[in-house]
Amino acid sequence: MSQLTHINAAGEAHMVDVSAKAETVREARAEAFVTMRSETLAMIIDGRHHKGDVFATARIVGIQAAKRTWDLIPLCHPLMLSKVEVNLQAEPEHNRVRIETLCRLTGKTGVEMEALTAASVAALTIYDMCKAVQKDMVIGPVRLLAKSGGKSGDFKVEADD
């Protein structure tokens, strides 16, 4: 079984030393969902929200969140991301918004946390912008879809049925 990399022999949390690692291209994709009433989703799709374009705002906030992950999660390294992508898609058949993020860099540590943070904070932004019309929206699940690069190898979730 793998060991927890952020816990030392004394059981103390610490930031992993990546100075000896080779720089490789690393990429991660994550997703999050925000489920809401059909009327709330229609308001977003039709651009009738009084606060403005919900998707455009969530996209920009998600990008900013990926870039600030190190500031939110203390044991994450500050990274020079080369790409952050945040895509939002309305899924009216499920009364929800799907958020998919992609983060990429050439570096010594992975970008899974950045992709997950981008998806999570974009979802929180949708909630924040729409809470005046619906407070019982549900955020989740949030999950890593895939990662590549680095010593631990590639990961990809199994296709959903």
UniProtKB/Swiss-Prot annotation:
It is an enzyme of class 4 (lyase). It catalyses: (8S)-3',8-cyclo-7,8-dihydroguanosine 5'-triphosphate = cyclic pyranopterin phosphate + diphosphate. It comes from the Bacteria. Gene3D superfamilies: Molybdopterin cofactor biosynthesis C (MoaC) domain. InterPro entries: MoaC, MoaC_bact/euk, MoaC_sf, MoCo_biosynth_MoaA/MoaC, Mopterin_CF_biosynth-C_dom. GO terms for molecular function: cyclic pyranopterin monophosphate synthase activity. Its EC number is 4.6.1.17. One of its GO terms (biological process) is Mo-molybdopterin cofactor biosynthetic process. Substrate binds at residues 75-77, 113-114. Belongs to the MoaC family. This is Cyclic pyranopterin monophosphate synthase. The lineage of its organism: Bacteria, Pseudomonadati, Pseudomonadota, Gammaproteobacteria, Enterobacterales.
